[in-house]
């Protein structure tokens, strides 16, 4: 008869957490920054098609690090949730807090019940009418959720990058200043002062999209030429 080995629940959860952390640590970092013009989302990502940043709904965006197939399935599920809720009730009922709660439940269920946890970390951002009304939520592989103030940093070098951002971030930063700060921070432990525009994926949730762009959709993906222009502007 084969001997059954006992593994305590504490050890099982620790092993799952260590497994997920190692997977996330291999991923390139993402920075999400609240600024005067809106919310800037910047990811170290040279791929032009495999996006780590995406639009969820009118004023809500998503950013992730980790395994692409896992966070892409979560992004698509978030879009479906937002569309159904907005259609069934009202567009104003679709909020970053509600979406983050759904993600937290999904991640927590996978972490405790499935064979392996998701190797992902997520950020859900919602731009407000004023900067005080911005919402930034960070979700980890086990379903833990945190309401962040000002900025979110995720990925393998999150602690070092967060120190750089925290040392220079101010609420008064404009979009150009937020982008320049993010690129300096993402260059941590690299032989350059800041990452080139071609090495990153970037997007913005504009604060005054309805008055400036005539649309409720605040999300806009930034092209390399947009990034080049922003990097030459004064912050």
From Swiss-Prot:
<comment type="similarity">
    <text>Belongs to the peptidase T1A family.</text>
</comment>
<dbReference type="InterPro" id="IPR029055">
    <property type="entry name" value="Ntn_hydrolases_N"/>
</dbReference>
<keyword id="KW-0963">Cytoplasm</keyword>
<protein>
    <recommendedName>
        <fullName>Proteasome subunit alpha</fullName>
    </recommendedName>
</protein>
<dbReference type="InterPro" id="IPR023332">
    <property type="entry name" value="Proteasome_alpha-type"/>
</dbReference>
<comment type="subunit">
    <text>The 20S proteasome core is composed of 14 alpha and 14 beta subunits that assemble into four stacked heptameric rings, resulting in a barrel-shaped structure. The two inner rings, each composed of seven catalytic beta subunits, are sandwiched by two outer rings, each composed of seven alpha subunits. The catalytic chamber with the active sites is on the inside of the barrel. Has a gated structure, the ends of the cylinder being occluded by the N-termini of the alpha-subunits. Is capped by the proteasome-associated ATPase, ARC.</text>
</comment>
<dbReference type="GO" id="GO:0005737">
    <property type="term" value="C:cytoplasm"/>
</dbReference>
<keyword id="KW-0647">Proteasome</keyword>
<dbReference type="InterPro" id="IPR022296">
    <property type="entry name" value="Proteasome_asu_bac"/>
</dbReference>
<dbReference type="GO" id="GO:0010498">
    <property type="term" value="P:proteasomal protein catabolic process"/>
</dbReference>
<dbReference type="GO" id="GO:0019941">
    <property type="term" value="P:modification-dependent protein catabolic process"/>
</dbReference>
<comment type="pathway">
    <text>Protein degradation; proteasomal Pup-dependent pathway.</text>
</comment>
<dbReference type="GO" id="GO:0004298">
    <property type="term" value="F:threonine-type endopeptidase activity"/>
</dbReference>
<dbReference type="InterPro" id="IPR001353">
    <property type="entry name" value="Proteasome_sua/b"/>
</dbReference>
<dbReference type="Pfam" id="PF00227">
    <property type="entry name" value="Proteasome"/>
</dbReference>
<dbReference type="GO" id="GO:0019773">
    <property type="term" value="C:proteasome core complex, alpha-subunit complex"/>
</dbReference>
<comment type="function">
    <text>Component of the proteasome core, a large protease complex with broad specificity involved in protein degradation.</text>
</comment>
């Amino acid at each position: 008869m084969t001997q059954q080995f006992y593994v305590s629940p504490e050890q099982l959860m620790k092993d799952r957490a260590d497994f997920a952390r190692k997977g996330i640590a291999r991923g390139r970092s993402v920075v999400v920054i609240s600024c005067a013009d809106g919310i800037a989302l910047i990811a170290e990502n040279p791929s032009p098609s495999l996006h780590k940043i995406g639009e969820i709904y009118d004023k809500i965006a998503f950013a992730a690090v980790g395994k692409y197939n896992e966070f892409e399935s979560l992004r698509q599920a978030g879009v479906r949730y937002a569309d159904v809720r907005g259609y069934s009730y009202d567009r104003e009922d679709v909020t970053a807090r509600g979406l983050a709660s759904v993600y937290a439940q999904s991640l927590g269920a996978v972490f405790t019940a499935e064979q392996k946890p998701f190797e992902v970390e997520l950020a859900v951002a919602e731009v407000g009418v004023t900067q005080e009304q911005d919402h930034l939520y960070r979700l980890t592989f086990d379903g833990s959720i945190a309401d962040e103030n000002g900025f979110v940093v995720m990925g393998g070098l999150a602690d070092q990058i967060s120190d750089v951002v925290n040392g220079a971030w101010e609420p008064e930063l404009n979009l150009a200043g937020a982008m320049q700060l993010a690129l300096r921070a993402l260059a941590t432990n690299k032989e350059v002062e800041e990452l080139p525009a071609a090495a990153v994926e970037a997007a913005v949730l504009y604060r005054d999209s309805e008055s400036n762009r005539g649309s409720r959709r605040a999300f806009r993906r930034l092209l390399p030429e947009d990034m080049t222009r922003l990097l030459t502007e004064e912050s």
